[in-house]
Every structure is written in C-alpha cells, then in structure tokens.
From Swiss-Prot:
Full protein name: Ketol-acid reductoisomerase (NADP(+))
GO molecular function, one term: NADP binding
Cofactor(s) for this UniProt protein: Mg(2+)
Organism expressing this protein natively: Bacillus licheniformis (strain ATCC 14580 / DSM 13 / JCM 2505 / CCUG 7422 / NBRC 12200 / NCIMB 9375 / NCTC 10341 / NRRL NRS-1264 / Gibson 46)
Classification via SUPFAM superfamilies: 6-phosphogluconate dehydrogenase C-terminal domain-like (SSF48179), NAD(P)-binding Rossmann-fold domains (SSF51735)
Length: 342
C-alpha cells in the first residue's frame, strides 16, 4: 500500500532559514509561490521578463531573472513546461546551484529521461500536486488542499525527504495527503494517463462517437451534445463519487447500456493497444519522439494540431458554445486565477 503523510507526520521548521525560488509563474508557479509565501516560507520568483514577471510583482513577490533567482536560492523548484526545462536549466539554473542545494520538479520527465542530469552534490526531489494550479490555490485559501505526490531522486544531505514533505505541506498538500512514489512511477503513470485515458484516449473516443452518429445521418449538433457536451455531467459524477456513484445517479437504461455496450467499445484489443502505449513510455520511445519533435520546431505537432482544430466537432462546438455563455464564464474565471501560461 502507498505511504501517505499528513501535516502531523511532517517535521516543523524544515524550511526555516531557506530561500525557495519558484521558476516559472504559470498555473502551478503562481499557486506554489503564493501558498509558500502565506505559509511563512522565504520565497522568490524567477521568470523571464514579460507578463508573468509583471504578474508576479503585482502579486507581491520579489521577482528576478531565472539565473538571479537560482543563484540566491537554497531550494529551486522548476515549474516550466517540460519542453522548456532542459534549455533553461543548462543556460540559467545549473551554474547557480551550490553543494547542498535542492533541485525540485513537479513532474519527473526530464530527470527520468536524462534530459536534465543534476549535479552529484545537490538533493533532487519531486513534489507534484494532483490538480491544476488554480485548484491548488483555491483549496489552500479555503483551508484545505490538493493531494500531492513526492519522490526522492538524489539525497546528498540526508534531508531530501524532510524537505520534500515540508514543501508539500507548505503548499497545502499535506492537508489532503502526500503520497510517496518514485520519479519512474510518477513519470510513467502520468504520461500513460494523459495518452491512453485523459487526453488521447478520451478525445479519440469522443471523435469516434461523434463521427459514428454524423456518418449515420444524425445532425452534428445532437451528436455534439451526446458525445462531448454531456461528458462533463458524467465526469463530474465520477470525480465526486467514483464509477459506482456515477452509475447510481444515471438512469437504469443508461447503466444497462454501460454494462453491455461499454466492453464492446473498449475491449481486449483496446487494452492491448494501451499496453503498447505503456511500453513506448517505459522504453523511452515516446520521450525520444517528443524531444526530437521539439528540436525540429514541431512540424508534426503543428500540422496535427491545425487539422484537429478544424474537425467538424470543433466547428459545430464553437457555434453551440455561443449559446451557452455559462461555459465561457467558467473558463474566464479559471484563466484569471491561473495567470499566464509560463
């Protein structure tokens, strides 16, 4: 069973006298920095000049360039997009690290796949809230928190675990529970969830359902509602009560259809495909492809993205969402809270 830590399990004053640099001020960065500050941690922000720099200053932080922040800090938390981290680390972070410092991540991709090779004389650990930045911030303000993962990659000082748990506590994670894992497990499960279920699997399922209905002659607007729009209703039930709770809340007709038709759609062949996806993650194939794609300025990524944005479900969806201003209101509120992307 996974080991879970709560506030009472974590040593006090571990971060006292230590300066934490949050690198990046996007969705996670703004939440970490504000929560750390309000927990009494000495925190600074490192970010490139621009909107994020101005927003961090507006929020009351001491803001520096990435290089300046890394040079001052005892603990450096890297909260940049995966594809930016390696270049920024090499150019602006690495030389500022001193023996006994801590290099911290919220996702293990670059360390696990050896894009970032930390110095041998620093602690390296991971603290990953299991929720977007606006939720990390909002729950903290409410006196609660979002569960988080932590993992130790390199413990030079003998204090890496204490520092990781103290950091997780300071951003509110230990109010809900901090789960112990490894860089390998966090990275591979996170990528698999994104690719096979949450993003890749789900979008492909939605499009296939939409296309099945429209190709059979049904109106695309109805297909959109049935295969995409109403998804939120079901996901919210699953999020709050699990699969059984969702099934309790839907009609018996829908539940019977779930039981008899769901396995026909997601069958053993699909599961075998999922295993292939997992294998590509585990052996580094996916990581290599993504790294190379970024090195050549993303030709496939950009082409696929442009094509997907003009799929019929998007064209229909844009029109239908104009009929539902409440959808956009929720999006605008979240964007204001989250701040800039990086």
């Amino acid at each position: 069973m996974v080991k879970v830590y709560y506030n009472g399990d974590i040593k006090e004053n571990v971060l006292a006298g230590k300066k934490v640099a949050v690198i990046g001020y996007g969705s996670q960065g703004h939440a970490h920095a504000l929560n750390l500050k309000e927990s009494g941690v000495d925190v600074i922000v490192g970010v490139r000049k621009g909107k994020s720099f101005a927003k961090a200053e507006e929020d009351g932080h001491q803001v520096f360039t990435v290089r300046e922040a890394a040079e001052q800090a005892d603990i450096v938390m890297v909260l940049l997009p995966d594809e930016q981290q390696q270049k920024v680390y090499e150019a602006e972070i690495k030389d500022g690290l001193q023996a006994g410092n801590s290099l911290v991540f919220a996702h293990g991709f670059n360390v696990h796949f050896h894009q970032i090779v930390p110095p041998a004389d620093v602690d390296v650990f991971l603290v990953a809230p299991k929720g977007p930045g606006h939720l990390v911030r909002r729950t903290f303000e409410q006196g609660a928190g979002v569960p988080a993962l932590f993992a130790i990659y390199q413990d030079v000082t003998g204090e890496a675990k204490d520092k990781a748990l103290a950091y997780a506590k300071a951003i509110g994670g230990a109010r809900a529970g901090v789960l112990e894992t490894t860089f390998k497990e966090e990275t591979e499960t996170d990528l698999f969830g994104e690719q096979a279920v949450l993003c890749g699997g789900l979008t492909s399922l939605v499009k296939a359902g939409f296309e099945t209905l429209t190709e059979a002659g049904y109106q695309p607007e109805l297909a959109y509602f049935e295969c995409l729009h109403e998804l939120k209703l079901i996901v919210d039930l699953m999020y709050e009560e699990g699969l059984a709770g969702m099934r309790y809340s839907i009609s018996d007709t829908a539940q019977w259809g779930d039981f008899v038709s769901g396995p026909r759609v997601v069958d053993e062949k699909v599961k075998e495909s999922m295993k292939e996806v997992l294998k590509d993650i585990q052996n580094g194939t996916f990581a290599k492809e993504w790294i190379v794609e970024n090195q050549v300025n993303r030709p496939r990524f950009n082409a696929i993205n442009a094509s997907e944005n003009e799929h019929q479900i998007e064209v229909v969806g844009r029109k239908l969402r104009e009929m539902m201003p409440f959808v956009k209101q929720g999006k605008k509120k979240e964007a204001v809270v989250a701040g800039a992307k990086n």
